[in-house]
A protein has these predicted regions:
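Active-site diphosphate/adenylate-binding microenvironment
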Residues: 2-62, 71-72
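A short, small-residue-rich loop immediately preceding and capping a beta-strand
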Residues: 75-88, 104-108, 303-311, 365, ...
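Iron-sulfur cluster-binding cysteine motifs and their immediate structural context
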Residues: 190-191, 196-202, 220-277
Length: 768
């Protein structure tokens, strides 16, 4: 019955780990095609579907091309091959390609692990120089090593004529190799991100005292950082001025490829460390002060379905609850349904507890037989596989309502940045309310509870990994577990991993079940939320805040220019479309965005005068320095492959330059402005003039029948995002969209009875 109704589907598709070398290594230049390998390379089929097609069995990588090559106009392909497969049988495929003399580039990823199956060591453990020597002996004439750290490789250890290039040059290297007439090899050297994380935790690999942060006031929300990194740790954050980006410090594996995004919002923190959570409570005293919950008797088998994201500890929750039940002498079975969970896919843990072991006859929870849904991820909690286990009126649900970014978000943002097309590649949305209603309907009225587990656990304990045990604590205190709190605490202790934090997370979950508002006050005091993260309550506040911002941006006269146009728009809308305010809101946001363009003066001001440095001080502690990653317009050299200006790192001294530049903003647009003749500033002025003319035309011809079109036209500035070449791409797409919509608007003006009130595609009114 739970599956008989249509569902709001937000897929949790497996994705490469944050910082995974595959995020970069599997890409190919525009116009080229790649063949997938096995293991993690296979995932490129859905993560890079326009570039990667077909796959083969282990050891057959690239071999189908030998048969295809004589019968196609395609001159060259790339074949992805892992170091594990290379050692096993991949060398035979390369040997066959050499004999066949086909134009192909083998990209051998040396990531030092059999990544997809858990990070086992590669048999043979061939080094980069050994692989280079081996393929040279097979007759490969063109070999290039690409790596995230060229200093690791000495030219003397490699065969003669094998260059070592930085991974930022990957596109240029591949363009060179695809012109090579025979078989070439690109050895991509970068350790598996998941394995790096494990080794750092165990002290087997240095953990660099360096973290990336994004100033979301400077961020334009263009997605170029996602295009450059393909990383799941670059997450969306909603602000009064639109959807921006942030770095999830808990999941970041310190790959730093996001720094290549063409944006001045990126800052690295070198030295110091993240501040600990606000309230890592002493376990013994807290446990003693909490009232004991009712323990479910489990007279019959009690089914707990844990639904979450791979790599976040879902399987650990199953193991802990299974251990705790065993400590109490109860019967228990735990079945983990993992699949591609290690790569950020969905994972389920089926936990069944009974008074005696002989009462348990199956490990898997059957359809409609879950007593408790512990939804550690709301997307997986709403999946068909999960809903099929629920029974209205019998199942209880405790669900983490915080959204964890999906692969679709990352890929959509990246595609927008690469193309500049926001009209066709729409901003991905997360229908939280619809998903919550779906889960609530599946379990019945009053039987589902939704808690911001990730936000609370991160604020309280400094790490989002604590969220799952926070949810366990909440369910336990609500009397939804057939296991005592003491046994769960003991199981956490026996597990031996991050004992203090995990026990504290469990106890904070229990406290939240007793008094959620009190826990909210501890986790998020009013001063912890930056003002720009607070969304306006109504249109008047939206306008007033932007008037204040424009006064700080330039001066009061500049702000009056904004307010005067808004007043005329509002009066016209009230007269022509009574009861409507969509046009006024669209202009309030769109006009502000074009007036407050983030030029050199504004970037300097946003870094120094808007609380960014103070927010950093609240998040980091110790002796740290700030490094800003910028491409100054007068100094940045273009990248020979992409044409984009290359970014450089600037130390903390640049803050003084920012402060001076911010104070000089009164020069903006005057004859003394050194930036006024740049291509970007000319574009800014043209866009502003054209938008003001557009709004005047919309206001003059506004009536109920064309109101929806007017709103869509006025909202177009939201589609202009980013800096430099990224912004220019977006502006060109927005211009073409404006031309199309304006033709229809004018046609409606000439033929007022033609078509009636148009219902357009939902306009992209992200806050800006």
């Amino acid at each position: 019955a739970a599956l008989a109704r249509p569902h709001t589907v937000v897929p949790r598709v497996p994705h490469y780990c944050s910082g995974c070398p595959h995020n970069t290594s599997t890409r190919v230049p525009e116009g080229s095609r790649a063949l997938a390998g096995i293991g993690c390379h296979y995932m490129a089929l859905w993560l890079n579907p326009d570039q990667t097609r077909t796959f083969s069995q282990m050891g057959g990588e690239g071999v189908p091309w030998i048969g295809q090559a004589p019968f196609t106009e395609t001159k060259h392909v790339f074949a992805n091959l892992g170091d594990g497969t290379y050692s096993h049988s991949g060398l035979l495929a390369i040997r066959q390609a050499v004999v066949a003399k086909v134009p192909i580039t083998y990209k051998i990823l040396v990531n030092d692990a059999v990544a997809m199956t858990g990070g086992q060591p590669v048999e043979g453990a061939l080094t980069v120089p050994e692989i280079a020597l081996q393929v040279r002996a097979e007759g490969i004439g063109r070999i290039v090593v690409v790596t995230d750290d060229p200093a690791r490789h000495s030219a003397s250890a490699l065969p003669a004529g094998v260059p070592v290039r930085h991974r930022r040059d990957l596109d240029a290297v591949q363009r060179e190799l695809r012109e090579y007439p025979g078989v070439s090899v690109l050895i991509y050297d970068q350790t598996c991100a998941a394995e790096k994380r494990r080794r750092r935790k165990r002290g087997l690999m240095p953990d660099p005292a360096r973290r990336v942060v994004i100033n979301d006031r400077v961020c334009e929300g263009c997605g170029d950082c996602s295009a450059k990194s393909n990383c799941m740790s670059v997450v969306p954050v909603e602000t009064e001025f639109g959807r921006k980006r942030a770095i999830d410090q808990s999941s970041c594996n310190k790959d730093f490829s996001c720094l290549e995004g063409f944006c001045p919002s990126f800052v690295t923190i070198e030295g110091g460390g993240l501040r600990k959570g606000k309230a890592a409570a002493p376990v013994s005293t807290e446990a003693d002060s909490l009232p004991e919950p009712v323990i479910h008797p489990a007279e019959r088998p009690y089914g707990i379905l844990v639904a979450g994201v791979g790599g976040t500890g879902v399987v650990t929750i199953g193991a802990l609850l299974g251990t705790a039940a065993t400590l109490e002498g109860k019967g228990v079975s735990v079945l983990d349904m993992a699949g591609l969970a290690q790569k950020g896919g969905p994972v389920w843990s089926h936990i069944r507890v009974a008074a005696r072991q002989d009462l348990l006859h199956a490990s898997r929870i059957a359809s409609g037989e879950a007593d408790l849904l512990l939804g550690c991820d709301i997307v997986v909690a709403a999946a068909d596989e999960t809903l099929s286990k629920l029974h209205a009126g019998a199942t209880r649900a405790v669900v983490n309502s915080d959204f964890a970014v999906t692969s679709d978000f990352v890929r959509s943002f990246a595609a927008q940045a690469r193309t500049g097309d926001v009209a066709t590649i729409r901003d991905p949305q997360f229908p939280l309310s619809a998903i919550e209603e779906q889960i609530a309907e599946a379990v019945g009225p009053g039987r589902a509870e939704f808690i911001a587990g990730t936000r609370l656990a991160t604020a309280l304990l400094g790490d989002s990994i604590a969220a799952n045990l926070f949810m366990v604590g909440y369910a336990c205190q609500k009397g939804l577990l057939p296991i005592s709190p003491a046994s769960i605490l003991r199981a956490i202790e026996m597990n031996g991993a991050a004992v203090e934090m995990n026990q504290a997370a469990f106890l904070w979950g229990r406290r939240a079940a007793l008094d959620l508002p009190a826990v909210e006050r501890v986790a998020t005091p009013p001063e912890a939320l930056p003002d720009h993260r607070r969304l306006s309550a109504d249109l008047d506040e939206t306008i007033a805040r932007r008037v204040a911002e424009l006064t700080a941006y330039q001066d009061a006269r500049y702000a009056r220019r904004y307010a005067d146009l808004l007043r005329r728009v509002r009066e016209a809308e009230t007269a022509s479309a009574p009861g409507q305010a969509g046009l006024t809101e669209a202009v309030a946001r769109g006009y502000y965005k074009l007036l407050a363009t983030k030029d050199e003066y504004e970037v300097a001001r946003l870094h120094t005068e808007t609380g960014f440095l103070e927010n950093l001080a609240r998040s980091f502690e110790g002796d740290y320095r700030l490094v800003f990653h910028l491409a100054p317009p007068l100094w940045a050299r273009p990248d020979p492959a992409t044409g984009e200006p290359r970014k450089r790192a600037f130390g903390p001294w640049v803050l003084q330059a920012f402060k001076v530049l911010a104070r000089l903003r009164r020069l903006r647009g005057t004859v003394l402005d050194p930036f006024r003749f740049s291509e970007d500033r000319k574009l800014d002025r043209r866009l502003l003039r054209e938008y003001e003319r557009l709004v005047e035309e919309l206001v003059a011809a506004l009536r109920p029948g064309n109101h929806a079109l007017a709103v869509e036209l006025a909202a177009l500035p939201d589609q202009i995002r980013g800096y430099g070449p990224i912004r220019r791409r977006h502006a060109e797409h927005a211009r073409r969209r404006e031309t199309s919509l304006l033709e229809e608007f004018r046609r409606r003006e000439d033929h007022p009875d033609d078509g009636g009130a148009r219902v357009p595609e939902a306009p992209v009114l992200m806050r800006g």
